[in-house]
Amino acid sequence: MLDIAMPKLECVAAAENYGRFKIEPLDPGYGHTLGNALRRVLLSSIPGAAVIKIKIDGIFHEFSPIQGVREDATEIVLNVKGIRLRSYAERPVKMILSKTGPGVVRASDIECPSNVEIVNPDHYIATLDSSDARLDMELTVERHRGYLPAENRDPVPIGEIPVDAIFTPVHKVNYVVEHTRIGGMTDFDRLLLEIWTDGTVKPGDALSYAAQVLVQYSSIIADFNRFDDEQEQVGDANGLVIPSEIYDMPIEDLDLSTRTYNCLKRADITKVGQVLEMDEKQLLAVRNLGQKSMDEIREKLIERNLLPTLPFNSAILNTNVAARLNDGSAE
């Protein structure tokens, strides 16, 4: 392998929500290669916490007015989206807000469990206009990545209001590539990277996490030679052999509903072969993918004659479907 100039990383400016970093020297072209890759990962793949739904006493939908409260439910939902959280919980947790008027309701009025912290306690939520006004609210917090619209989640019970969740703690990333000198050579790159966060994560920690994500993905390619280059078929741990042309088929070709498609994509399931390798229990374990979506996936596979091309002990085939295929009734 050719020698690569090993760069040094330096933090040239730091604040609670801002960091400016310098990486140099880089071989020509590597400034944009690293800068663009880090920027994309920083904006999309850093985990964070957000409110995913709320429940307000006496309110059944987001268009309802609340007696004694200046804002209606829709405005409160918009204000709740601005609460920035730091959560150490593996599962969704609940926070409680109970406030009587008159007065202003802020994020600091919310009671949090020990593993959740509000980093902007002065954030405005609502105003109670009278002494008999009361606002009782339950907020559900979850950790995830990126942005999750309310319409892409399972329907919630009556009385609960879903919230568009902005999980990513990184607000903005800029990078600039400049020329730098090594000895008499002036065509090396200097990468200047600026990161703005919401305060729930330090810019330096976000940069480190983004680099680890890139390393994990790159390691898959680096280990490519460990696999048999002559292998033309892909098999799972259960001995199921899937022809490569079927395995590599994108899930877009199944023409799934938007909801089912988004569930698979968020779980990094992008190929039909990945679906065929999973049994029903594994598929149902995919976040927000229920029995209805499971049945839809199975029907789409049968519709496109993808299941009959495989042994009838295929992971996704249950006993009833296998019987139908053997009888010819599933064609």
UniProtKB/Swiss-Prot annotation:
Q: Name one GO cellular component term.
A: DNA-directed RNA polymerase complex
| Alphabetical list of CDD domains matching this protein | RNAP_alpha_NTD (cd06928)
Disulfide pairings: none
Task: Say which domain of life the source belongs to.
Answer: Bacteria
Which EC class does it fall in? Answer: transferase
Q: Which UniProt keywords apply?
A: DNA-directed RNA polymerase, Nucleotidyltransferase, Transcription, Transferase
Q: Under which EC number(s) is this enzyme classified?
A: 2.7.7.6
One annotated GO molecular function is: DNA binding
Q: Which Gene3D superfamilies match?
A: 5' to 3' exonuclease, C-terminal subdomain, DNA-directed RNA polymerase, insert domain, RNA polymerase, RBP11-like subunit
GO aspect biological process, one term: DNA-templated transcription
Q: Which reactions does this protein catalyse?
A: RNA(n) + a ribonucleoside 5'-triphosphate = RNA(n+1) + diphosphate
User: Which segments carry the region annotation Alpha C-terminal domain (alpha-CTD)?
Assistant: 243-331
How this chain assembles, per its entry, is: Homodimer. The RNAP catalytic core consists of 2 alpha, 1 beta, 1 beta' and 1 omega subunit. When a sigma factor is associated with the core the holoenzyme is formed, which can initiate transcription.
Q: What is known of its domains?
A: The N-terminal domain is essential for RNAP assembly and basal transcription, whereas the C-terminal domain is involved in interaction with transcriptional regulators and with upstream promoter elements.
**What job does this protein perform?**
DNA-dependent RNA polymerase catalyzes the transcription of DNA into RNA using the four ribonucleoside triphosphates as substrates.
Give the family per the record: Belongs to the RNA polymerase alpha chain family.
User: Which named protein is this?
Assistant: DNA-directed RNA polymerase subunit alpha
What organism, scientifically named, is this protein from? Herpetosiphon aurantiacus (strain ATCC 23779 / DSM 785 / 114-95)
Q: Which gene encodes it?
A: rpoA
